[in-house]
């Protein structure tokens, strides 16, 4: 039985996907994709599923997501799901389709929050006193 493990990251959210032979079920934190709320997040998560089409009919994907907020978790999940579908099927045309639609379906967003600097640490990394000219 073929099993593929992939990872998607966005800020502090990490999604780990496991794809194996099955009947086309997708579960996120043991909850079916169809039951995800709010609707905006469900629709964003459906994008790789809709693009894959019939290629997804014999794949089961289980995704565990931790850290971050709702939107970061959604982006990390999309990336992990997209990578899992492409890696499991091994189809280059599917990879090209994903990349032309939205690059973040296969490539994690590398941006992270900037560390706070020592001077005004609680206020943020670039906080300065407001300058007064008179």
UniProtKB/Swiss-Prot annotation:
UniProt KW keywords: Ribonucleoprotein, Ribosomal protein
Record's keyword annotation contains Ribosomal protein: yes
Domain of life: Archaea
Positions of region (Disordered): 109-134
One cellular-component annotation, GO: cytosolic small ribosomal subunit
Bias kind Basic residues: ranges: 118-134
UniProt xrefs under InterPro entries: Ribosomal_Su5_D2-typ_SF (IPR020568), Ribosomal_uS9 (IPR000754), Ribosomal_uS9_archaeal (IPR019958), Ribosomal_uS9_CS (IPR020574), Ribsml_uS5_D2-typ_fold_subgr (IPR014721)
Record NCBIfam families: PRK00474.1, uS9_arch
HAMAP family, per the entry: Ribosomal_uS9_A
The protein's name: Small ribosomal subunit protein uS9
């Amino acid at each position: 039985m073929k099993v593929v493990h992939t990872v998607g990251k966005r800020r502090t959210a990490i999604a780990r996907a496991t794809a194996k032979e099955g009947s086309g079920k997708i579960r996120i934190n043991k909850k079916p994709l169809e039951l995800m709320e709010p609707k905006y997040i469900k629709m964003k998560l459906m994008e790789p599923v809709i693009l894959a089409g019939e290629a997804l009919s014999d794949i089961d994907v289980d995704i565990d997501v931790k850290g971050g907020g709702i939107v970061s978790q959604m982006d990390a999940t999309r990336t992990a799901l997209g990578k899992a579908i492409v890696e499991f099927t091994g189809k280059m045309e599917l990879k090209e389709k994903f990349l032309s639609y939205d690059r973040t379906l296969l490539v994690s967003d590398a941006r992270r929050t900037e560390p706070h600097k020592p001077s005004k640490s609680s206020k943020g990394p670039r906080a300065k006193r407001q300058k007064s000219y008179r």
